[in-house]
From Swiss-Prot:
This is Glycine--tRNA ligase. Homodimer. InterPro entries: aa-tRNA-synt_IIb, aa-tRNA-synth_II, aa-tRNA-synth_II/BPL/LPL, Anticodon-bd, Anticodon-bd_dom_sf, Gly-tRNA_synthase/POLG2, Gly_tRNA_ligase_bac, GlyRS-like_core. Catalyzes the attachment of glycine to tRNA(Gly). One of its GO terms (molecular function) is glycine-tRNA ligase activity. It comes from Borrelia hermsii (strain HS1 / DAH). It catalyses: tRNA(Gly) + glycine + ATP = glycyl-tRNA(Gly) + AMP + diphosphate.
Length: 445
């Protein structure tokens, strides 16, 4: 059984994730991504973008700003609805969401009865001011979601691209929520990244597209990221669980060490957002779609797919992590990341630091450097170097030895099976590229 403590230890030790401001004691709910973490995160983002935008001729990208006028959040309902009712336990000083407590059983932490404060509202949005003077007239918010930047640009994208319904707008960006309890490492944080797509459809086509995107998104995790299918499930929201903007919602949940939790939400937002902005900005025609063939004018319905990028990093680490017992009593920690998202694709390892092997190894390294992020390691025994690469998820290790000088071949070792094959140096690049493209994924091994 994988423990979240194992993942946290690996993440810091190997440079995936660090505590923010650690030298000053750290900042709760905020994390920095190290050399390997940023590569893993960017690789996941790249695969998502290819799958959502490049694979669909009717989906385009957008990068909206973090800061927007406060009217955007008034219209969206966040100013009124994006808050939690909280109570504090007077005995242990812990704070809880009011809907998470059974008052008849007392405090979930210390079991004290009748020690709660009166409920009070807790705003989940971060406020700031824009301009030289702090005043309510220039108060703005750090965005709590990326979706609204898409909705307020609906007309700009429609006019500039000449897209026709159905079409989608995708973006990746940071969002901020003043989380009451930031917990489970990078799963729930105050600063996070979302990968969202808003898909605009005719109301009569909502059900078909809603189902389409559910299946499309589930397949992304299994086929592209290589997540084990047994660790994924759908969970549909009940009526009282729906957000204020949603007509229907279904989550894709992943089985983390702390249980099944949402990794992506697929929502039927109806025409709530576009209608709200049409109403509040006083320009309703900006949010209408005119079908030139049928002559219909209507406000499109919206299907949202919202995936947490930072949560995806945690998911891939948990899913790939394994502690193996090998023959002879040896052990290894291995990250079986899909090669497409692994930080390093190949490690080049000269057997020794002499006799021309480092020079040849550098030449082999240069074969890949334009297309793949590579690692060069000449320190320690070859066995220890293999173990170091296993632990950070490098799928292929290439050893340059004395035979490499004589017959121009190298040894390629597969991370997952530890099997080795001898390959001509001139064929190495095409071999690795084919291996990455044809990799079956963790769930099929």
């Amino acid at each position: 059984m994988i423990r979240i403590e194992d993942i946290i230890s690996l993440a810091k030790r190997k440079g995936f994730v660090f505590q923010s401001s650690e030298v000053y004691g750290g900042l709760s709910g905020v994390w920095d991504y190290g050399p390997l973490g940023i590569e893993l995160k960017q690789n996941i983002q790249k695969e998502w973008w290819k799958n959502m935008v490049y694979s669909h001729e009717n989906v385009v990208g957008l990068d909206s700003s973090i800061l927007m006028r406060s009217e955007v959040w008034t219209a969206s309902g966040h100013v009124e609805s994006f808050a939690e009712l909280l109570v504090d336990c007077k005995n242990c000083k812990n704070r809880f969401k009011i809907d998470s407590i059974d008052f008849s059983k007392g405090c979930p932490n210390c079991n004290s009865m009748g020690t709660f404060t009166d409920p009070r509202s807790f705003d989940l949005m971060f406020k700031t001011n824009i301009g030289a003077v702090e005043d309510s007239s220039n108060e703005i918010y750090l965005r709590p979601e990326t979706a609204q930047g898409i909705f307020v640009n609906f007309r700009n994208v429609l006019d500039s691209t000449r897209l026709k319904v159905p079409f989608g707008i995708a973006q990746v960006g940071k969002a901020f929520r003043n989380e009451i309890v930031a917990k489970n490492f990078i799963f729930r944080t105050c600063e996070f990244e979302q990968m969202e797509m808003q898909f605009f459809v005719h109301p009569n086509q909502m059900d078909d597209w809603y189902y389409y995107w559910q299946q499309k998104r589930l397949n992304f995790f299994i086929e592209i990221l290589g997540i084990k299918s047994d660790n994924l499930r759908f969970k549909e929201h009940k009526g009282d669980e729906l957000a204020h903007y949603a007509k229907a919602a279904i989550d894709i949940e992943y089985k983390f060490p702390f249980g099944f939790q949402e990794i992506e939400g697929i929502h039927n937002r109806g025409n709530y957002d576009l209608s709200q902005h049409a109403k509040f900005c006083g320009k309703p025609k900006l949010f209408e779609y005119h079908d030139l063939i049928s002559g219909d004018r209507y406000i499109p319905y919206v299907i949202e797919t919202s995936l947490g990028l930072t949560r995806s990093v945690l998911m891939t680490l948990c899913d790939a992590y394994a502690h193996e017992e090998l023959e002879g009593g040896d052990k290894r920690i291995v990250l079986r990341l899909h090669p497409k998202i692994a930080p390093y694709k190949v490690a080049i390892l000269p057997l020794v630091k002499k006799d021309g092997l480092p020079e040849l190894a550098r030449k082999v390294f240069m074969q890949f450097s334009d297309d793949f992020y590579m690692f060069y390691d000449d320190n320690g025994t070859i066995g220890k170097r293999y173990r170091r690469q296993d632990e950070i998820g490098t799928p292929y290790c290439v050893t340059v030895d004395y035979d490499s000088i004589e017959n121009k071949t190298v040894t390629l070792r597969h991370r997952d099976t530890m099997t080795q094959v001898r390959i001509p140096i001139n064929d190495l690049y095409s071999y690795v590229r084919t291996e990455i493209l044809n990799y079956k994924g963790v769930s099929d091994r």
